[in-house]
Amino acid sequence: MTKDQICALRERAVWKKLSSELSWTEELLTKYADQVDWKELSSNEKVLWTESLLRKFADKLDWEELSTNRSLALQSPDIIRPFALYWHWDDKTKNTAWTPKFVAEMKEHLDWKELYQSASYEDQEFYLKEFFEYVSQLPFNENSWRRSRYFDEYVDAQWKERATEILSHVK
């Protein structure tokens, strides 16, 4: 390697570290946009993530890395919603604290397998009841379904309804 190549390599390494460690703001990113390592920056939880920053640098950001970023700012519906077409939903689904209302709003985008598998038992039951059309498409076997409390409630309700109907025909 030449001296210039070594200097360039070291400079890239410094910017990679700066990109992953500093609490960047939109103002700083505007000033240093050409030096920043955008992949590293996209996974940096210390960045002051705002809708304005995401809009301004949407074409530079690594959205796959950003989707795995656990920054609380990136879990906000106000940040997620406008960029629905950019997120990698398998990762975003895993790395966001979902409320029932926001699940309902973003149901078409969510990775239901990830959402369901990472959910608490209570949330799984809620998803099964409220979003059956999505959950029912997951690759479950018969035993998976039978272990669900909702399955038992459904069987009990249907049994009672049908038993009443059948017995109403007996004279």
Residue ranges and their predicted role:
Residues M1-K171:
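Alpha-helical scaffold segments
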